[in-house]
C-alpha cells in the first residue's frame, strides 16, 4: 500500500470516524503522505504545539511512569528539509522511542534540532554512542548528545531567616510539581540561609510553568518581589566513571576550619589515606589514595559535626571535556557544537552553592579574579530553544561548584601559583591606597607659589583620541595655562644659564628658576627602573619652591639632567593646588 492509498483509506473508512482526521501540523506539510504512512506503521500519534511537532509521548500501549531523567538525547545539525519520516527509522534502531519532538518554523521547515526520548536510560546512551555523526544525507552529519533536561529553578530574594520547610511550603502553594527545595546555610551564620534556594520539579515542563508564574511582577512571596531564573542543571555522569572516583566533596564547613583539621578528621579511619585537601571558603575537596577509603569516610562522616557545623559529604563528579563545554555554552544562553576545554580533568558537585557566584547573586557586583566565570550573559534568541523545548539555563550566575569558585576547574586556582604579585611603585613613602584598579595610581602633591589666587582653577584638558597622546600632553595642558612668565630682570641670567647648558656646572646651586625644564620624575625607592623620557611633563617651565632636602640629595640622579644642578630630575615639592599625578605613566608597574 502506498502512502496515498493509506491516506485515502484512513479518510474514507466510515467505521473510523473523527479519529482519522489528519492532525494539525501534519495536514498541509510538504511530506504529509510520508508522515501519515509513518503514523500508520508505528501506531504513534503526532501533534504540533508550541512551535514543536511531537511524535508519540507516550507510545501505543505504554503503561507506567514517565521515563526517568537521562532518557532523552538532543539531536542537532538536522537538515531543514528532514522530518520524522527520516528521523524515526534511524533512532528506533537503538531502542524504543517514547517521544520525538521536532522544533518547527513558521514556514513548515524544521529549526535544525530535535529531542528524542527513549523508554530506558541505556537506550539513550547507546544512541549517543552509535548515532552521533550519523550521515542522514550525503555529507550531512547529525550531532547527538545527552539532553540537558533542566528541572531546577533558582529563586532569590528569600528572607534569610526562613527554614527549608517554610520555603518548600510557600513554593508548593503557588506552583505545582515541586519535588525538593535545596537551601544552603550562610557561611558566616549557620542559622541563616543565603537568601536563595533551588527548587526541583518533577519535569521540565512543570519547571517552565513555575518559572513563568513566578516571574517578577506577577507574584510576591513573603510580601516582596523575588528573582527567578533557570538554575544550571545537574550534570549527569556515567555510572562507570563514578565508580572510579576517590575524591570527596565536603560542604557546610566553618570559615575558620583549616585544611589540616579536615585532613585529620577524614584520615582518622586509615592513617595516611588522605593525599591532600583543597579548602575554598566553606567547602573542600578531599583526595584519597583509594576509593574504598573515600567511600568509608563518606559513610561515616556525612551528617556529623566538625567544629560545630554539620557536614555534607558526597563523591565529587568528574566532567568530560565535551559535556563541560556544552554546559558552559548553555550557561551563556546558547548551544551548538562542543569545543575542547583546556582545564581538564576537573570535578564538580552537582549543586554547589559555595562559590563566589552565590555571594552577590542576583546582583552583578561580583569582584575578584574569577568574575568572568560567574557572570553569564546572552539570551536565547533566533533558533534557540524556547518554551517547553528549552533545555538551557538563563543568563545568570553559575552555581555548579568544584575546584574553583567559577565552574569546577581546579587548575584555575593554580594558573598563577608561584607568580609574584604585581605592585606599583610609590612616589610618596609609606603612602597606602586601596587597590581599586589593575593599574597602580598614587597621588603626588606639588605647588607653584608664584601663581597667586587668580589661577585658582585649572582649565580642562581636551580629551585626545589616542591614548599615547593623552599620556604625553596631559600635564602639559594642565601646567601650560598657569605657567609663570619669566621676570625681565632675570632674562640675562636665564640666557647665561642656557649658554652654560653645554657643560656640566661645577657649582651645586641650581640654574635660575624660570630657565629649568621639568625632567622625568624619580621614585624614592632605590634601584627602581625609571622611564628615560620626560613623558607626560612635556617642556613646561616651573620654578622650584625650595632647595634640595637631605632625602632628595641621597637619591639617584639622572646623568642627562646633571647640567641643571643637584636638584635636577626631581618633581617640585609644592603646588598651590593638588594634582593627581598618574604614577603608572611615570613608573613601570609591569
UniProtKB/Swiss-Prot annotation:
<dbReference type="GO" id="GO:0003723">
    <property type="term" value="F:RNA binding"/>
</dbReference>
<dbReference type="GO" id="GO:0005737">
    <property type="term" value="C:cytoplasm"/>
</dbReference>
<dbReference type="GO" id="GO:0019899">
    <property type="term" value="F:enzyme binding"/>
</dbReference>
<dbReference type="InterPro" id="IPR047044">
    <property type="entry name" value="RBM47_RRM1"/>
</dbReference>
<dbReference type="GO" id="GO:0002244">
    <property type="term" value="P:hematopoietic progenitor cell differentiation"/>
</dbReference>
<dbReference type="InterPro" id="IPR000504">
    <property type="entry name" value="RRM_dom"/>
</dbReference>
<dbReference type="GO" id="GO:0070935">
    <property type="term" value="P:3'-UTR-mediated mRNA stabilization"/>
</dbReference>
<feature type="modified residue" description="Asymmetric dimethylarginine; alternate">
    <location>
        <position position="407"/>
    </location>
</feature>
<feature type="domain" description="RRM 3">
    <location>
        <begin position="246"/>
        <end position="318"/>
    </location>
</feature>
<protein>
    <recommendedName>
        <fullName>RNA-binding protein 47</fullName>
    </recommendedName>
</protein>
<dbReference type="InterPro" id="IPR034440">
    <property type="entry name" value="RBM47_RRM2"/>
</dbReference>
<dbReference type="InterPro" id="IPR034445">
    <property type="entry name" value="RBM47_RRM3"/>
</dbReference>
<feature type="region of interest" description="Disordered">
    <location>
        <begin position="1"/>
        <end position="26"/>
    </location>
</feature>
<feature type="modified residue" description="Omega-N-methylarginine; alternate">
    <location>
        <position position="407"/>
    </location>
</feature>
<dbReference type="GO" id="GO:0030895">
    <property type="term" value="C:apolipoprotein B mRNA editing enzyme complex"/>
</dbReference>
<keyword id="KW-0694">RNA-binding</keyword>
<comment type="similarity">
    <text>Belongs to the RRM RBM47 family.</text>
</comment>
<dbReference type="GO" id="GO:0016554">
    <property type="term" value="P:cytidine to uridine editing"/>
</dbReference>
<feature type="modified residue" description="Omega-N-methylarginine; alternate">
    <location>
        <position position="396"/>
    </location>
</feature>
<comment type="subunit">
    <text>Homodimer. Interacts with A1CF. Interacts with APOBEC1; form an mRNA editing complex. Interacts with RBPMS.</text>
</comment>
<dbReference type="GO" id="GO:0005634">
    <property type="term" value="C:nucleus"/>
</dbReference>
<feature type="compositionally biased region" description="Polar residues">
    <location>
        <begin position="1"/>
        <end position="21"/>
    </location>
</feature>
<dbReference type="GO" id="GO:0003729">
    <property type="term" value="F:mRNA binding"/>
</dbReference>
<keyword id="KW-0507">mRNA processing</keyword>
<keyword id="KW-0488">Methylation</keyword>
<keyword id="KW-0963">Cytoplasm</keyword>
<dbReference type="InterPro" id="IPR012677">
    <property type="entry name" value="Nucleotide-bd_a/b_plait_sf"/>
</dbReference>
<dbReference type="GO" id="GO:0060340">
    <property type="term" value="P:positive regulation of type I interferon-mediated signaling pathway"/>
</dbReference>
<comment type="function">
    <text>Single-stranded RNA-binding protein that functions in a variety of RNA processes, including alternative splicing, RNA stabilization, and RNA editing. Functions as an enzyme-substrate adapter for the cytidine deaminase APOBEC1. With APOBEC1 forms an mRNA editing complex involved into cytidine to uridine editing of a variety of mRNA molecules. Through the binding of their 3'UTR, also stabilizes a variety of mRNAs and regulates the expression of genes such as the interferon alpha/beta receptor and interleukin-10. Also involved in the alternative splicing of several genes including TJP1.</text>
</comment>
<dbReference type="InterPro" id="IPR006535">
    <property type="entry name" value="HnRNP_R/Q_splicing_fac"/>
</dbReference>
<dbReference type="Pfam" id="PF00076">
    <property type="entry name" value="RRM_1"/>
</dbReference>
<dbReference type="GO" id="GO:0008380">
    <property type="term" value="P:RNA splicing"/>
</dbReference>
<dbReference type="GO" id="GO:0032733">
    <property type="term" value="P:positive regulation of interleukin-10 production"/>
</dbReference>
<dbReference type="GO" id="GO:0003730">
    <property type="term" value="F:mRNA 3'-UTR binding"/>
</dbReference>
<feature type="domain" description="RRM 2">
    <location>
        <begin position="151"/>
        <end position="233"/>
    </location>
</feature>
<feature type="domain" description="RRM 1">
    <location>
        <begin position="71"/>
        <end position="149"/>
    </location>
</feature>
<feature type="modified residue" description="Asymmetric dimethylarginine; alternate">
    <location>
        <position position="396"/>
    </location>
</feature>
<dbReference type="GO" id="GO:0006397">
    <property type="term" value="P:mRNA processing"/>
</dbReference>
<keyword id="KW-0677">Repeat</keyword>
<keyword id="KW-0508">mRNA splicing</keyword>
<keyword id="KW-0539">Nucleus</keyword>
<dbReference type="InterPro" id="IPR035979">
    <property type="entry name" value="RBD_domain_sf"/>
</dbReference>
Amino acid at each position: 500500500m502506498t502512502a496515498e492509498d493509506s491516506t485515502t483509506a484512513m479518510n474514507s473508512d466510515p467505521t473510523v470516524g473523527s479519529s482519522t482526521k489528519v492532525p494539525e501540523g501534519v495536514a498541509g506539510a510538504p511530506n504529509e503522505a510520508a508522515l501519515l504512512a509513518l503514523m500508520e506503521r508505528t501506531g504513534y500519534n503526532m501533534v504540533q504545539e508550541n512551535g514543536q511537532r511531537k511524535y508519540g509521548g507516550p507510545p501505543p500501549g505504554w503503561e507506567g511512569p514517565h521515563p526517568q531523567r537521562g532518557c532523552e538525547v538532543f539531536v542537532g545539525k538536522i537538515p531543514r528539509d528532514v522530518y520524522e519520516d527520516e528521523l524515526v527509522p534511524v533512532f528506533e534502531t537503538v531502542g524504543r522511542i517514547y517521544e520525538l519532538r521536532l522544533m518547527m518554523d513558521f514556514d513548515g521547515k524544521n529549526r535544525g534540532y530535535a529531542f528524542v526520548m527513549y523508554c530506558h536510560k541505556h537506550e539513550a546512551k547507546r544512541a549517543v554512542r552509535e548515532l552521533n555523526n550519523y550521515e542522514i544525507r550525503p555529507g550531512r552529519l547529525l550531532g547527538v548528545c545527552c539532553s540537558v533536561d533542566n528541572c531546577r529553578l533558582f529563586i532569590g530574594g528569600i528572607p534569610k531567616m526562613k527554614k527549608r520547610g517554610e520555603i518548600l511550603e510557600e513554593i508548593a502553594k503557588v506552583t505545582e510539581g515541586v519535588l525538593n527545595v535545596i537551601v544552603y546555610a550562610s557561611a558566616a551564620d549557620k542559622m541563616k540561609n543565603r537568601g536563595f534556594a533551588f527548587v526541583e520539579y518533577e519535569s521540565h515542563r512543570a519547571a517552565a510553568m513555575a518559572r513563568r508564574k513566578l516571574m517578577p511582577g506577577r507574584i510576591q512571596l513573603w510580601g516582596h518581589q523575588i528573582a527567578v531564573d533557570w538554575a544550571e542543571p545537574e550534570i549527569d555522569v556515567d555510572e562507570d566513571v563514578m565508580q572510579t572516583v576517590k575524591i570527596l566533596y565536603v560542604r557546610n564547613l566553618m570559615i575558620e576550619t583549616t585544611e589540616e583539621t579536615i585532613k585529620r578528621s577524614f584520615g582518622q579511619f586509615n592513617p595516611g589515606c588522605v593525599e591532600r585537601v583543597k579548602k575554598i571558603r566553606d567547602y573542600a575537596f578531599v583526595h584519597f589514595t583509594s576509593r574504598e577509603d573515600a567511600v568509608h569516610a563518606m559513610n561515616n562522616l556525612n551528617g556529623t559535626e566538625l567544629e560545630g557545623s554539620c557536614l555534607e559529604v558526597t563523591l565529587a563528579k568528574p566532567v568530560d571535556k565535551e559535556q563541560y563545554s556544552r554546559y558552559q555554552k548553555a550557561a551563556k544562553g546558547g548551544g551548538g557544537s562542543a569545543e575542547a576545554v583546556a582545564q581538564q580533568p576537573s570535578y564538580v558537585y552537582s549543586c554547589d552553592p559555595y562559590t563566589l557566584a552565590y555571594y552577590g547573586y542576583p546582583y552583578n557586583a561580583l569582584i575578584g579574579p574569577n568574575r568572568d566565570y560567574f557572570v553569564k550573559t546572552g539570551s536565547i534568541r533566533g533558533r534557540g530553544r524556547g518554551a517547553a523545548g528549552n533545555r538551557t539555563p538563563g543568563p545568570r550566575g553559575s552555581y555548579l561548584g568544584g575546584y574553583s569558585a567559577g565552574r569546577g576547574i581546579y587548575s584555575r586556582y593554580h594558573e598563577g601559583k608561584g607568580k609574584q604579585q604585581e605592585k606599583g611603585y610609590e612616589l610618596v613613602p609609606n603612602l597606602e591606597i586601596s587597590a581599586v584598579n589593575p593599574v597602580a595610581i598614587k597621588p603626588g602633591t606639588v605647588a607653584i607659589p608664584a601663581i597667586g589666587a587668580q589661577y585658582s582653577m585649572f582649565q580642562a584638558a581636551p580629551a585626545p583620541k589616542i591614548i599615547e597622546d593623552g599620556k604625553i600632553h596631559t600635564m602639559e595642558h594642565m601646567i601650560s595655562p598657569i605657567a609663570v612668565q619669566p621676570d625681565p630682570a632675570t632674562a640675562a641670567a636665564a640666557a647665561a644659564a642656557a649658554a652654560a647648558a653645554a657643560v656640566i656646572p661645577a657649582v651645586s646651586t641650581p640654574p635660575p628658576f624660570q630657565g629649568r625644564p621639568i625632567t622625568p620624575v624619580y621614585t624614592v625607592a632605590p634601584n627602581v627602573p625609571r622611564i628615560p623620557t620626560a613623558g607626560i611633563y612635556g617642556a613646561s617651565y616651573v620654578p622650584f619652591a625650595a632647595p634640595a632636602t637631605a632625602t632628595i640629595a641621597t637619591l639617584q640622579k639622572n646623568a642627562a639632567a646633571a647640567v641643571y644642578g643637584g636638584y635636577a630630575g626631581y618633581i617640585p615639592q609644592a603646588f598651590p593646588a593638588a594634582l593627581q599625578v598618574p604614577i603608572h605613566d611615570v613608573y613601570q608597574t609591569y
